[in-house]
């Protein structure tokens, strides 16, 4: 799937970028995932922009650079910006402005370690939700009555129950998974 997109786009595409791009239409459909609570004014703020933070491990600890206006960027642009910001964070040369303004966070714990056991991530306040993905791995699946090895990606979400109820979260994740399972759709969302 990724190789197909890379061929079509003519550039390297990360799995994190693919999931981030898939999040955009799901966030538009379920906008409370892209909202926050303004505690001072006791109100819900629905953000017009989709600014997706991505958790980045550095020697100095966790940093969360933000892809601002991700909904206005191509898949190739998102992937390139993730690479640039992650490298700046690891070198401790990232601008503070690039660590602010996120409306939701994506954590790719699958890029580290050989095990994919992961707890529930903590929401990055004041955001309403965080999505965590594990590594892609072959798992048994039944296809046309046959058991075959199929690449799978596990994902979990944590969310602020003051904004998002369980059914809304399940529908959001279902939509996100449907988009990821049809990678050709990623090119059509912007």
Residue ranges and their predicted role:
Residues 1-190:
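C-terminal catalytic/motor cores of large multi-domain enzyme assemblies
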């Amino acid at each position: 799937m990724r190789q197909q997109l890379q061929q079509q786009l003519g550039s390297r595409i990360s799995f994190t970028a693919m999931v981030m791009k898939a999040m955009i239409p799901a966030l538009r459909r379920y906008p409370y995932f892209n909202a926050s609570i303004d505690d001072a004014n006791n109100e819900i703020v629905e953000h017009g922009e989709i600014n997706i933070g991505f958790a980045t491990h550095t020697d100095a600890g966790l940093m969360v650079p933000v892809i601002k206006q991700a909904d206005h960027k191509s898949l190739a642009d998102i992937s390139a910006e993730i690479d640039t910001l992650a490298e700046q964070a690891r070198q401790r040369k990232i601008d503070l402005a690039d660590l602010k303004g996120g409306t939701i966070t994506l954590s790719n714990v699958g890029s580290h370690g050989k095990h994919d056991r992961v707890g529930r991530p903590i929401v990055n306040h004041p955001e309403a939700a965080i999505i965590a993905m594990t590594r892609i791995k072959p798992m048994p699946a039944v296809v046309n009555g046959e058991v075959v090895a199929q690449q799978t990606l596990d994902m979990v979400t944590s969310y602020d129950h003051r904004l998002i109820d369980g059914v809304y979260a399940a529908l959001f994740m279902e939509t996100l998974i449907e988009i990821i399972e049809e990678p050709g759709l990623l090119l059509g969302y912007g």
